[in-house]
């Protein structure tokens, strides 16, 4: 039973993180009459613009997080980012707080070490070779053990921050320093991963709901500087590869538990899949589902965590998304070229409403459909390029 937003009987959803993904979750909550409270470390974040109320605080501050939860008394706490005081969520969940999908899932996936050890060591799933290091000396030793080339990442970061590929011994020290600068909560532990030989990588959006585990069509994507540039759905895969991907994804989401949508990242080589990472929430590459599916990843997430059935996931056909990236300094961002962008057949644009930019930032996404995923991707890229950003 749902109450009515703004009334005493409201069903309240507290978003921890209010970026573009949180904004779409907030909109889907609004469609079900839920009361939305959006939180982030800065004011006027995208989800705050479509929420009933908002709070600005450092979500790594356990005391501040406790205060907001005590004030709002949410029925659902929905993390959108990794940088949260997850130990506090675990503590509060034990007292009856409903954390989506679970506090333990949020804790394990907030850094790469927890989820990698779960997948490889507890579940026995295929992953790249890896070692962890928390000093330069142990890092250099890990690189020697794994061998070159290898990948270095902070255990806690997103959007490619702090990630680099080490190809020569001369790059080792610089990779360590870069990882220390790129961690979400400051300098600290890193993972060194062996290079994976793969044909392509996918995101398999997997929904754990009251009526079972459901899979969206696989999403292919292209990364640059550790961040997604384009994604498309469906990614063509062999039947055996799809079965292997669904098996790995189901093992992971069942181990994490709870209800919600998970973005399971996998490398694919022929019929074989290798687990990479998982987000217990909507995924940036999944923004393509805003145009490719009857129910977007955001609608699926909200349905799942509120205990509603998913039923059949309907995919409309070849579709794609392309990030609209800004590079500059401004607190008064403006856009034009939308008339040109939207004159391209079967395209849509989402501008996120981010209040400022300092460097590189994703400010929107272009969406398109086509007869093939290549046609859809080409249209999405053309659409994104047509949007001009003024700083």
From Swiss-Prot:
PROSITE patterns to which the protein is assigned, alphabetical: ATP_GRASP
Purpose of the protein: Involved in the de novo purine biosynthesis. Catalyzes the transfer of formate to 5-phospho-ribosyl-glycinamide (GAR), producing 5-phospho-ribosyl-N-formylglycinamide (FGAR). Formate is provided by PurU via hydrolysis of 10-formyl-tetrahydrofolate.
Enzyme Commission number(s) of this protein: 6.3.1.21
NCBIfam families on file: PRK09288.1, purT
Catalysed reactions listed for this entry: N(1)-(5-phospho-beta-D-ribosyl)glycinamide + formate + ATP = N(2)-formyl-N(1)-(5-phospho-beta-D-ribosyl)glycinamide + ADP + phosphate + H(+)
Highest taxon of the lineage: Bacteria
Assembly: Homodimer.
GO cellular component terms attached to this protein's record: cytosol
Gene source species: Vibrio cholerae serotype O1 (strain ATCC 39315 / El Tor Inaba N16961)
Pfam families reported for this sequence: ATP-grasp (PF02222), PurT_C (PF21244), RS_preATP-grasp-like (PF22660)
Binding of N(1)-(5-phospho-beta-D-ribosyl)glycinamide, residues: 20-21, 80, 284, 354, 361-362
Enzyme class: ligase
Domain ATP-grasp residues, every copy: 117-306
Official protein name in the record: Formate-dependent phosphoribosylglycinamide formyltransferase
Pathway the protein acts in: Purine metabolism; IMP biosynthesis via de novo pathway; N(2)-formyl-N(1)-(5-phospho-D-ribosyl)glycinamide from N(1)-(5-phospho-D-ribosyl)glycinamide (formate route): step 1/1
Keyword annotations: ATP-binding, Ligase, Magnesium, Metal-binding, Nucleotide-binding, Purine biosynthesis
Family assignment from sequence similarity: Belongs to the PurK/PurT family.
């Amino acid at each position: 039973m749902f109450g009515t937003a703004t009334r005493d009987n409201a069903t309240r959803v507290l978003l921890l993180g209010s970026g573009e993904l949180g904004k779409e979750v907030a909109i889907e909550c609004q469609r079900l009459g839920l009361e939305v409270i959006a939180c982030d470390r800065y004011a006027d974040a995208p989800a705050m613009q479509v929420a009933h109320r908002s709070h600005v605080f450092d979500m790594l501050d356990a005391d501040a997080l406790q205060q907001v939860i005590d004030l709002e008394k949410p029925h659902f706490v929905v993390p959108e980012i990794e940088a949260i005081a997850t130990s506090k969520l675990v503590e509060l969940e034990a007292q009856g707080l409903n954390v989506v999908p679970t506090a333990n899932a949020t804790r394990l996936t907030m850094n790469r070490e927890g989820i990698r050890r779960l997948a490889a060591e507890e579940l026995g799933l295929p992953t790249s070779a890896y070692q962890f290091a928390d000093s330069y000396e142990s890092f250099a030793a890990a690189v020697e053990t794994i061998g070159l080339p290898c990948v270095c990442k902070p255990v806690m970061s997103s959007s490619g921050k702090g990630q680099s590929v080490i190809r020569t011994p001369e790059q080792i020290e610089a990779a360590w320093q870069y990882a220390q600068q790129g961690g979400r909560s400051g300098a600290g532990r890193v993972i060194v991963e062996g290079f994976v030989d793969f044909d392509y990588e996918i995101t398999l959006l997997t929904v754990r709901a009251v009526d079972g585990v459901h899979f969206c069509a696989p999403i292919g994507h292209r990364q640059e500087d550790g961040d997604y540039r384009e994604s498309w759905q469906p990614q063509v895969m062999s039947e055996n590869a799809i079965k292997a991907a669904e098996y790995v994804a189901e093992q992971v989401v069942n181990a994490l538990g709870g209800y919600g949508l998970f973005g399971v990242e996998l490398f694919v080589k022929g019929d074989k899949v290798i687990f990479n990472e998982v987000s217990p929430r909507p995924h940036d590459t999944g923004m393509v589902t805003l145009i490719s599916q009857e129910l977007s990843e955001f609608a699926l997430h909200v349905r799942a965590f509120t205990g509603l059935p998913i039923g059949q996931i309907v995919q409309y056909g070849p579709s794609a998304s392309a990030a609209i990236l800004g590079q500059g300094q401004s607190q008064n961002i403006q856009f034009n070229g939308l008339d040109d962008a939207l004159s391209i057949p079967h395209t849509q644009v989402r501008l996120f409403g981010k209040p400022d930019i300092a460097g590189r930032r994703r400010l929107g996404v272009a969406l398109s459909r086509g007869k093939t995923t290549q046609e859809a991707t080409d249209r999405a890229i053309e659409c994104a390029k047509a949007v001009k950003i003024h700083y």
